[in-house]
Amino acid sequence: MNRVTIRVPATTANLGPGFDAFGCALGLYTDVTFEETDSGLEITGCDEAYRGPDNMAYTAYCAVLASLSEEIRGVKIHIDAHIPICRGLGSSTALLVAGAMGANVLRGNKLSTQGLLNITNAMEGHPDNLAPAFYGGLTASMVEGGLPVTVSFPLHPDWQFLALVPDFNLSTPLARSVLPEQISRADAIYNIAHGALVLKALELGDEPLLRTAMQDRLHQNYRRKLIQDYDAIAALARTNGAAFCLSGAGPTLLCITRSKKLREVLTEKLPGVTRRSWEILPLHVEFQGAHVLESC
């Protein structure tokens, strides 16, 4: 085998109070093909600025080969990305995961999924996105002793996820720069309690509980100021029964509901509360994590 295509799902991190811990895989994908050659690097399917050796798929590919003490020969990489870039849906994570898994498959799957998670977490440091991208479904992660630890949680089958993707991006460094260096004990307790109930509400399909539990005091109140019309959109979603949160660091906004009518309501009423353009993406939870799409 010298050619493999890896499919990686989009991910949404935090889910309100689960800051840097919770993540969920969603049904939107990036496919990356790796074909070994004798020498050189060729990357297609992305902007010219991302076709060099600092491409995240390539750096993860090389990191896995280095961990296996394997020679890094030439490679052709083709990226077919359907995850919006810099929108809080794990576009960078998808490239890292694809690169790591692609290298591992081409070398006979010598590393476990946990091993790949360890390597990519050392590169990015965000297991809240990496874990659901590798494992699928809903996960909670922590880092202990420098290594990520992940647990999967059940989800009620009736949840509908609507991602509201704006016509502007927001970099993660900027979104982190507005966060306070210290928090109060009361805010820490608030998020711990709400986070625990988010997981239970998602399991039970309890929409009123999820709507309340998805409140947070650690990041969303600071980041909302970077997103035009955040408050108006949040009020619209919650008034119509949905739980609401930032997707990752934003600017994508996430509505979670059991109602099949919310998309229609948002399509009709969203233009009345914002002058920006927002694409409404209905997404299902993807329970299959990164995997081989085809190989030869």
Show the residue positions of the predicted features.
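Glycine-rich beta-alpha junction loops
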Residues: 28, 137, 165-170, 217-218, ...
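Acyltransferase
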Residues: 158-240
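Short beta-strand segments
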Residues: 7-9, 25, 133-136, 142, ...
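Gly/Ser-rich oxyanion-binding loop with an adjacent helix/lid
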Residues: 71-149
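Glycine-rich, charge-dense phosphate/pyrophosphate-binding loop(s)
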Residues: 202-296
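Solvent-exposed alpha-helices and their adjacent loops that cap or buttress functional pockets
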Residues: 12-14, 23-26, 69-70, 88, ...
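Short beta-strand-to-turn element immediately C-terminal to the catalytic PLP-Schiff-base lysine
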Residues: 35, 133-135, 139-144, 255-258, ...
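ATP-binding N-lobe of GHMP and related small-molecule kinases
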Residues: 1-87, 101, 105, 109-111, ...
